[in-house]
Design a protein with these regions (language model features):
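Short secondary-structure boundary/capping elements
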Residues: 46-49, 69-72, 95, 122-126, ...
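Catalytic beta/alpha-barrel core
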Residues: 65-70, 87-96, 115-120
């Protein structure tokens, strides 16, 4: 979405193009990993740290954290996961409550962005009940504190847990979203 792509120069310009660029990078990483494996000890391709890391994602060694707010973005992330078989963690997921079955079926955990960020655009359909709805649906969920630039807003995380409790989540479960559940994800 625009919240993430605006942080990078040469940004894709559309969600479809962004997904196509991610797909292209995964394909490059697959090819790179095949060439490295085929080379054995000699004639290996030039080292590429980005492709090495993406190959580790595709091998399931590390999860991919994909920011997706709208239901359509979430479904795109799930399609990429199915296509390439990597471990996925959804980040943001403001409209996750609209695609619960798909998220649950994929076995994907969700890290929900702070409720205090109530902008328009991709967050216009966000609800303060998302965390409870996800938890009630059996989807692993955690809350994040958000950040300002590169500075985490750690003071916000307890507020977010309190908001989850205020909107129907039992206290112990709300506390778990910022402690043990977050650690498990």
């Amino acid at each position: 979405g625009p919240e993430v792509s605006s942080n990078f120069s040469g940004r894709p310009g559309s969600r479809a193009k962004g997904a196509a660029l991610v797909r292209a990078e995964f394909i490059k990483a697959q090819d790179y990993a095949r060439r490295v494996k085929a080379s054995g000890n000699g004639n290996a391709p030039a080292r590429d740290l980005k492709l090495e890391t993406l190959a580790r994602v595709l091998d399931g060694e590390i999860p991919a954290l994909i920011t997706a707010q709208r239901a359509s973005e979430i479904l795109t992330a799930l399609r990429l996961q199915r296509e390439f078989g990597f471990r996925l963690v959804l980040d943001g997921a403001a409209e996750a409550y609209l695609v619960l079955d798909e998220i649950r079926e994929a076995g994907v955990p969700v890290i929900v962005h702070p409720t205090m960020a109530r902008h328009g655009g991709t967050l216009e359909n966000a609800t303060l009940e998302t965390v409870r709805i996800l938890r009630d649906a059996g989807i692993p969920v955690a809350l994040q504190s958000g950040f300002e630039g590169y500075v985490p807003k750690t003071r916000v995380v307890l507020f977010e847990a309190a908001m989850a409790a205020a909107y129907g989540m039992p206290f112990e479960q709300a506390l778990a979203t910022v402690t043990i559940d977050a650690a498990r994800i």
